[in-house]
Amino acid sequence: NLFISNLDSIPIPDWSLLPELKKFYRPAGDSIKRSPSAGIVTSRGCDGKCYFCNPWQLGKMIRYHSAEYIYRMIVDLMRNHGIRDIYIQDDTFVINRDNVMQFCKILIEEKLDITWACHGRANHIDIDLLRAMKMAGCWQIAIGIESGSQKILDSINKGTTVEQNYKALKLCEEVGLDVKGLFMIGCFGESHETIKETIDFIKKVHITDFHMNFFTPLPLTSAIKLWPKYGHFDSSKGSFMGSTPSFIPFDLTEEELIYYHKYVYR
């Protein structure tokens, strides 16, 4: 009862309350097609049960703004703040396929001069959806691939397969969408062999941008309860963003994890 079920009942954000929106409140540069850009959130919750995340913080039921509400938010940002590019920051924007298709339809019909990027899961992506997104101004989709090893995907309860990831990336390439591939290293059960599987995967697929973080058991996640079965964890190390290793799987050393992380970025 603490959560708002109808997100459209919330007024559109009053961005004028923020000082110099265009200057200080913009997404990271790798998610921007053109400036000025702004980020928005169109839903709350996630249907994933990944061990490294805590989607229940925003409620177990996923709630969405309607396509019409999202459109009004974007129009307000364009007309009143000069925004030309939008970064949709939901964990996975494409879960509600019908809503995304309606959103794309509105943008196409209204001929908005806007570019946008979003996040998605491989198992929610299909060719018709991607084509509609592309026509509506989408230029990039960030996909949480995490690993090229099925063993690792299962160990973190990702709920996707290596084959689904291959297929989703191939469809994005076919449609002409840029892909930001999001990966983790040092997950439960990680080994030299599974890291090599991920490296081989990366070499084969269509990815135009790339991020790899160190797996980190965060508070209030399943990972924080499960890590003793899989390795060593020092909560004083690492960071919320996973930029340095804090969890070390039994089959690897901290130095080896850092080496592989640097190797992948070369």
Regions found by a protein language model. Name each.
Residues 1-7, 182:
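Short intrinsically disordered, low-complexity coil segments enriched in acidic
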Residues 3, 22, 193-266:
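C-terminal accessory regions of radical SAM enzymes
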Residues 4, 64, 97, 158-162, ...:
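Short, solvent-exposed loop/helix junctions and linker helices
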Residues 6, 49, 95-97, 150, ...:
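Short catalytic/ligand-binding loop motif for oxyanion handling, primarily in non-cytosolic enzymes
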Residues 15-182, 200:
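Radical SAM [4Fe-4S] cluster-binding motif and immediate context
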Residues 41-43, 185-187, 247-252:
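Short, well-ordered beta-strand elements within core beta-sheets of diverse protein domains
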Residues 89-96, 121-122, 185-189, 213-222:
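Short, solvent-exposed turn/loop segments enriched in Gly/Ser/Thr/Pro and often Arg
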